[in-house]
């Protein structure tokens, strides 16, 4: 099958161009971010990222020309293998889950593969499920398929990545035509947990929820179920808070008030905001960022790589990067909408949700609008597993676009 095929190839080529642009930006920024590092090993990170780019492009080409039917047939097998690999990390870590398997110079981060596995298994199940969108059993199966890997990743502990599964879950269910009241059931317990930090705010939220349920009239059973779940969510908040790791609690508290620990947990957010703000409209210039070169920004090649972009290339540089991401998301939605094969459509939507969620969270961290969760910026942040998975997702979207007429 030729890569260029009339008008259908234009979207694929544009998606490829956006991905390549972001990856090159990542390599350039990683080089700048670590150029002043006293470690020669860190200075060469950009060279390793170039090697990962070659591997990622190879994976992209393979995925583009691989029959989508193959992913559909082996969806459950891939999911089972990934779950076993996640469980195996607990034995590897001696009771405490590690986050990757080491193969010489290469570390395999299983949670990255788990994102794809969840997308495939949800797409497979929803494509062949004959139950109505509002079926309780169908809803329960989908929750189980997402909850298993999500809880295993959360146990590592990796809160940021576990939230990606939630984004996939909500987006794919919405695309499957889940009625509004059911979406309310998914989202409202999270709001209830947040609101329960202050008793008065939780009472107001719960009353508003009851009024909304009365207005929507989803049925007695659903209304009672939603009310009970939200009631329990509010009650168990102290238990959930106590189960969080100390650094996770501090990240949340510092997100609300960075000045609480300016030299500790709040240091990252404060320095990141200084870097982005000091970049102005046009930036300080390549390799001229003071916050970057003086290493005031921690994890500047991974979690806070957007801060380096903001400082060195300014507001317009950051906007250009965000436009590239927006193009990928919008073109992906267009592909998902026109796909005749529902499996392909679900896969594209799931992939888009991963990229969009990680961009929002990562950029939000750099701007101090989100708590620090450790999620990388797709295509840009340093890391082989993340880069390859980003390109695999892009390959799946292009694959679906090339074969959108197939059932």
For the regions a protein language model found, what residue spans apply to each?
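Membrane-helix boundary/helix-loop-helix interface segments in multi-pass membrane proteins
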Residues: 1-17, 21-22, 28-166, 170, ...
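Hydrophobic alpha-helical transmembrane segments
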Residues: 51-56, 115, 312-332
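Hydrophobic, glycine- and aromatic-enriched re-entrant/interface helices and adjoining loop segments
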Residues: 96-100, 195-318, 342
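Helix-loop-helix junctions and helix-breaking kinks within/between transmembrane helices
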Residues: 147-182, 187-215, 237-240, 244-245
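Interfacial segments of multi-pass membrane proteins
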Residues: 163, 168-184, 191-194, 291-314, ...
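Small-residue-rich helix-loop
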Residues: 275, 331-338
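Loop-to-helix entry and N-terminal half of a specific, functionally important transmembrane alpha helix
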Residues: 335-373
């Amino acid at each position: 099958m030729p890569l260029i095929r009339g008008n259908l190839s234009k979207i694929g080529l544009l998606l490829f161009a956006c991905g390549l642009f972001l990856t090159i930006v990542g390599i350039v920024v990683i080089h700048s971010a670590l150029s002043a590092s006293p470690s020669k090993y860190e200075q060469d990170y950009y060279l390793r990222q170039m090697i990962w780019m070659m591997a990622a492009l190879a994976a992209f080409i393979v995925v583009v020309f691989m029959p989508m039917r193959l992913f559909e047939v082996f969806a459950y097998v891939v999911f089972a293998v990934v779950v076993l690999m996640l469980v195996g990390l607990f034995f590897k870590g001696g009771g405490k889950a590690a986050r990757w398997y080491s193969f010489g110079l290469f570390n395999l981060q299983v949670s990255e593969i788990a994102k794809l596995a969840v997308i495939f298994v949800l797409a497979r199940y929803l494509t062949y499920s004959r139950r109505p969108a509002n079926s309780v059993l169908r809803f329960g199966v989908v929750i189980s398929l997402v909850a298993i890997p999500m809880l295993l990743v959360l146990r590592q502990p990796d809160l940021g990545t576990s939230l990606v599964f939630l984004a996939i879950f909500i987006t794919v269910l919405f695309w499957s035509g889940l009625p509004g009241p059911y979406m309310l059931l998914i989202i409202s317990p999270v709001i209830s947990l947040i609101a329960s930090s202050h008793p008065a705010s939780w009472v107001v939220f719960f009353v508003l929820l009851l009024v909304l349920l009365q207005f929507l009239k989803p049925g007695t059973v659903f209304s009672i179920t939603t009310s009970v779940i939200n009631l329990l969510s509010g009650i168990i908040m102290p238990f959930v808070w106590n189960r969080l790791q100390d650094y996770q609690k501090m990240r949340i508290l510092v997100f609300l008030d960075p000045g609480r620990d300016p030299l500790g947990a709040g240091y990252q957010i404060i320095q990141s905001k200084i870097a982005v703000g000091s970049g102005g409209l046009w930036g300080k210039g390549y390799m001229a960022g003071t916050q970057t070169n003086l290493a005031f920004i921690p994890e500047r090649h991974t979690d806070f790589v957007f801060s380096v972009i903001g400082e060195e290339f300014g507001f317009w540089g950051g906007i250009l990067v965000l436009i590239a991401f927006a193009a990928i998301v919008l073109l992906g939605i267009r592909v998902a909408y026109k796909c005749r094969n529902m499996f392909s459509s679900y896969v594209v939507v799931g992939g888009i949700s991963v990229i969009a969620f990680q961009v929002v969270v990562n950029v939000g961290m750099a701007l101090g609008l989100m708590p620090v969760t450790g999620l990388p910026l797709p295509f840009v942040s340093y890391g082989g597993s993340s880069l390859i998975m980003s390109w695999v997702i892009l390959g799946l979207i292009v694959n679906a676009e090339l074969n959108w007429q197939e059932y």
